[in-house]
UniProtKB/Swiss-Prot annotation:
Topological relation to the membrane, as annotated: Multi-pass membrane protein
Descriptive protein name: Lysophospholipid transporter LplT
Function in brief: Catalyzes the facilitated diffusion of 2-acyl-glycero-3-phosphoethanolamine (2-acyl-GPE) into the cell.
Species this protein is from: Cronobacter sakazakii (strain ATCC BAA-894) (Enterobacter sakazakii)
Main location: membrane
Annotated PANTHER family: MACROLIDE-EFFLUX PROTEIN, MAJOR FACILITATOR SUPERFAMILY (MFS) PROFILE DOMAIN-CONTAINING PROTEIN
Pfam hit, one: MFS_1
Gene expressing this chain: lplT
């Protein structure tokens, strides 16, 4: 790796660009691999119920490893942690490519993703500071969403042509991410010398949880980002049922296109937040959170494709504007109190727990045969009220 660099360097320094490129390739691989592996399961006649298990093992890896991955990120150079994590993803993809059990391979990818996340966000606070950190987060989120959009489409399209080729492209993407990690400046460990025994590590993690929860700013950020990502994954599944009911379209492509509009909107919103919101004025993002819920209500009531596409673009814009400043706030304040890696690990625990809870409630609503339009309206209203409540809570602190 190159020598260490000052955290006050340019936003477009070689180190920052290496982080962004590595993140794009890694996220591209994650999303392309999901759809390529789903195609493999169909090709090998796995039962349909097995498909969501892929996402479950991915999320569960984040939750189970949450007490440990933050310390790993803070105990070593974060660039090296990212490289090893992408190496685990590469290994998982290779297992699937060469005919191994796809669930074992995808579990390895999930473990790599869980280890990668605290390092990728924590390193931003080490190679840039202050308001540049908000802009760096904007670049990171834009890169991630672009990779999600392109990777998902590429995975599905390539799998339709040749499943093996699709899986091979995923492995190449991870290999490229490992290569990009080599260009990240070698930084010192943020918090070296911590105990590696199970008891102290778990106590350290839950101490970090308590520390962040008892701080007004980090608690505010944790709750806000967890609500956002929990709602985001729920909206993705809501679209699958909403499209045939509201638009009368029964193909598989339309929900994907609608999801793409959300992704494009998030990229634009993240860019706007980087320019308009600072850490000192982070509450400026809160109206956007409320508007997400209101826009979901209007979207759920649509019966034509064009306004649906436009509203989802708007929902994505509000989402990007809302979540980027909250991420930056947590990284900046968390770095000072518990270390950036531990802060992001705690954030991952909150976000993935919120995903499981919200999806569970959504599944219950579907099982109770509630109308999907009603579910969408209720979901949007509850989200808007929850963000409004969070904003009021923040103002009272």
């Amino acid at each position: 790796m190159p020598d260490s660099q000052s955290p006050n360097g340019s936003l477009f320094s070689r180190g920052m660009m290496a982080v962004i490129v590595a993140q794009f390739l890694s996220a591209f691989g994650d999303n392309a691999l999901l759809f390529a592996t789903l195609a493999l399961l169909k090709q090998q006649f796995y039962p349909e119920w097995s498909q969501p298990v892929l996402q479950m093992v991915f999320v569960c890896a984040y939750i189970l490893l949450a007490p440990f991955v933050g310390q790993v990120a803070d105990s070593f150079s974060k660039g090296r942690v990212m490289m090893v994590a992408n190496g685990l993803k590469l290994l998982g993809a290779v297992v699937i490519v060469f005919g191994g059990n796809p669930f074992v391979g995808y579990t390895l990818v999930g473990v790599g993703a869980a280890a990668y996340s605290p390092a990728k966000y924590g390193i931003l606070g080490e190679i840039t500071t202050g308001d540049r950190l908000v802009k760096a987060n904007g670049l990171m989120e834009s890169s991630t969403i672009a990779a999600i959009l392109i990777g998902s489409m590429a995975g599905g399209m390539l799998a339709d042509w040749h499943v093996g080729a699709a899986l091979g492209v995923c492995a190449l993407a991870y290999a490229g991410a490992v290569g990009a990690n080599l260009l990240i400046p070698k930084l010192g460990a943020a918090r070296p010398g911590q105990s590696w025994r199970f008891g102290p590590m778990t106590r350290s993690f839950f101490t970090a949880c308590r520390t962040l929860w008892h701080n007004d700013e980090t608690r505010f950020s944790l709750v806000g980002t967890s609500m956002f990502w929990g709602a985001g994954v729920t909206l993705r599944f809501l679209l699958v049922l909403w499209v045939p009911v509201a638009l009368g379209i029964t193909d598989n492509a339309t929900p994907t296109y609608l999801n793409a509009m959300v992704a494009v909107g998030i990229v634009a919103g993240a860019g706007a937040a980087a320019k308009l919101v600072t850490l000192e004025r982070v509450s400026r993002c809160m109206p956007a959170g409320i508007l997400i819920g209101i826009a979901v209500i209007f979207f759920s009531l649509q019966q034509a494709a064009l306004p649906a596409y436009l509203l989802l673009l708007l929902i994505g814009f509000f989402g990007g504007f809302f979540v980027v400043p909250l991420n930056a706030l947590l990284q900046e304040r968390g770095k000072r109190s518990v270390g950036a890696g531990n802060a992001i690990a705690v954030q991952n625990l909150g976000e993935n727990t919120a995903m499981l809870l919200m999806l569970g409630l959504y599944s219950l609503a579907v099982k109770l045969s509630l109308p999907v339009v009603g579910i969408g309206v209720g979901f949007g209203a509850i989200f808007a009220l929850a963000i409004a409540g969070l904003w009021l809570w923040r103002r009272k602190q």
